[in-house]
């Protein structure tokens, strides 16, 4: 008997595979809590120094370097379409699938989870009319799942999932109440009823591949599962900044106001209750102190300087910028003089190159997901053009609108430059629908210039399905000898 191909082995008992995958999911989920605590800027007791008194631990600051870094990458990523083969424009059907699944909202959230935990997942399934009520049966269900709800076992022989599990917790988030097992040829679903697993659904898709595509934040070829962007060096700088801010707050509270020594004065004169001995702080905060006793003396210590703490925080911010590539202005370490536009772009160069690299990795995952969705909905193999699919990403840099317009105008050069008009419009970021409308206007202007508007010139020469231009009504000649009928 012929052995199954790698990654296409049959699952002998789905229930056993489910239990094994749920156990593996819970094991890996334990390692994700530390990532979440850093991203959420939670207080971490282990970040406090060993000599810090218990009373000061409540002053431990929330430092958001990890969130700032992760969000700075994710917010620059936006998919604009999928181009097949040598096509000039993005594929309309694939983009409709993207929009129908709200992936313009869900995908960026998946990128954030991938940077925090090292990976996210894309799941593909056929709509079930009994479950997915109101869903278009010709549109696949494409979802983005975080690693806190899903786990996929990667087969190192093929670099793709061998099986995957997705779980759903109860309202308290303590117990798993539903699970979906993805295998190369079938998808199984269960839910819990009175503590027992009950079969929910099954979908024998027969793809020969698990309909789950990881979104791994890979940094090396050997890194199959992805690595968190919250690296050990970034964690150590975050903890150090939290400790320094805690000490600065304590110093400001204890020694930020000048302390005074007063001799030869009765306690009642400086606002001390004679019965309880409680200081009322009137003299402590007063600007002018006056006492009746001529022998009274007062001396004052200098207030504590906090510059050493702020200098330390500046050095930590510079280390964070060196580790992450964040521009100085993101960390509030820019100079007093405003930077020029060229200086800002130069400062963002590392961040932009990192986003472009992430786009290439995530773009490959989206292309594989769209190919699986095509096979799932239409059957058979994908067309050759889909094997050369390209994910179209928005420009991750931040040029001003005026700068983009100036560059496009110079490159187009009124038809004499190095790029055509349509390329200039693409560089400006106009959508497909906007460019189609512009082409219609171009043709109308050309027809008006030649005096052909309203004649037998083709009403729709290039853009199928676009609205036809309506010519202006011709004036009716007046009827001699009376009013028009």
Swiss-Prot record:
BP GO terms, sorted: symbiont genome ejection through host cell envelope, long flexible tail mechanism
Residue stretches of biased makeup (Pro residues): 464-476
Keyword Membrane recorded: no
Annotated localization: Virion
Keyword vocabulary terms for this entry: Capsid protein, Viral capsid assembly, Viral genome ejection through host cell envelope, Viral genome packaging, Viral long flexible tail ejection system, Viral penetration into host cytoplasm, Viral release from host cell, Virion, Virus entry into host cell
Pfam short name (any one): SPP1_portal
Any one cellular-component term (Gene Ontology): viral capsid
Sequence segments annotated as region (Disordered): 456-485
InterPro entries, per the entry: Portal_protein_SPP1_Gp6-like
Highest taxon in the source lineage: Viruses
Oligomeric form and interacting partners: Homododecamer.
Functional summary from the UniProt entry: Forms the portal vertex of the capsid. This portal plays critical roles in head assembly, genome packaging, neck/tail attachment, and genome ejection. The portal protein multimerizes as a single ring-shaped homododecamer arranged around a central channel. Binds to the terminase subunits to form the packaging machine.
Similarity remark: Belongs to the SPP1-like portal protein family.
Protein name: Portal protein
Natural source organism: Mycobacterium phage D29 (Mycobacteriophage D29)
